[in-house]
UniProtKB/Swiss-Prot annotation:
This protein's record includes keyword Isomerase: no
Keywords: Endoplasmic reticulum, Gluconeogenesis, Glycoprotein, Hydrolase, Membrane, Transmembrane, Transmembrane helix
Metabolic or biological pathway: Carbohydrate biosynthesis; gluconeogenesis
Tissues/organs with expression: Liver and kidney.
Protein name as catalogued: Glucose-6-phosphatase catalytic subunit 1
UniProt short sequence motif Prevents secretion from ER, positions renumbered to this chain: 354-357
CDD domains, per the entry: PAP2_glucose_6_phosphatase
InterPro entries: Glucose-6-phosphatase, P_Acid_Pase_2/haloperoxi_sf, P_Acid_Pase_2/haloperoxidase
Protein role: Hydrolyzes glucose-6-phosphate to glucose in the endoplasmic reticulum. Forms with the glucose-6-phosphate transporter (SLC37A4/G6PT) the complex responsible for glucose production in the terminal step of glycogenolysis and gluconeogenesis. Hence, it is the key enzyme in homeostatic regulation of blood glucose levels.
Top class in the EC scheme: hydrolase
Amino acid sequence: MEEGMNILHDFGIQSTRYLQVNYQDSQDWFILVSVIADLRNAFYVLFPIWFHLKETVGINLLWVAVVGDWFNLVFKWILFGQRPYWWVLDTDYYSNSSVPIIKQFPVTCETGPGSPSGHAMGAAGVYYVMVTSTLAIFRGKKKPTYGFRCLNVILWLGFWAVQLNVCLSRIYLAAHFPHQVVAGVLSGIAVAETFSHIRGIYNASLRKYCLITIFLFGFALGFYLLLKGLGVDLLWTLEKAKRWCERPEWVHLDTTPFASLFKNLGTLLGLGLALNSSMYRKSCKGELSKLLPFRFACIVASLVLLHLFDSLKPPSQVELIFYILSFCKSATVPFASVSLIPYCLARILGQTHKKSL
């Protein structure tokens, strides 16, 4: 088993080496792709856009992103996936030969296990939702036309082009092995396809959001404690990252498994609070919400405010405080975009309309 994994990992190292040597000019492109594919952009950019254009798509997108990343966390704890940037330096596989030289980058040194790839899984799930939702909107209940078939081909070609670039990016940056990004893409699509058949997420009560948030946290914590009780160190990757990363400042606490867990749970609970708030009912369910200019105003205001909000980084000196603040910050993102911003704009535009009469 170990010998087979070593061969698989060696193939990944050779793939990374090949990309880094032959595509040096594409370094900035691969870094950009990796940054764009980060799940943070699904929360801060894609969600507010889709929610105010088509509410159900935005809700579905957020659920897929959150639950998909939760499954990614559990899979990583089970699979104990290595990462290229530390494996190539830590293994004795190359004891009888020279160790391949692998470059590291500021976005390389993630601290969680490597399998499956979170970037590949998140991008696959989120973009699958956007493609299938767009096709459903344009098709409606009519018989597919020639134009729709062309759109279908273009969107799916675009989808797979994105996945290919994300996968190559993660391999180039020595953050993942090839088999890990493939597993991520397949897992992300599976989660998105599953949620396309779940209708209860669109009218879930606040109680249901709270119960699901508690369940996801309780299961993850219980699973962590169970494995720890069995003598399994689930934070083994943090030591690897700190030991083998070229620069200490490249090791970021916000890439640890628990940081991801708290951010996702905060996002889900924030969505539940927003959708069940009186501010949401007064703004997004009123006559004003049907107007396209109002929706675009909500999108622009959300993107600007969330961009400023994203620049606020919780202090990471104390892990517990960092996790709590990350949870609160993440909960604020959907609450502001879904409830607070539309409510404020509705009040302002409503008063302006009254004065003009």
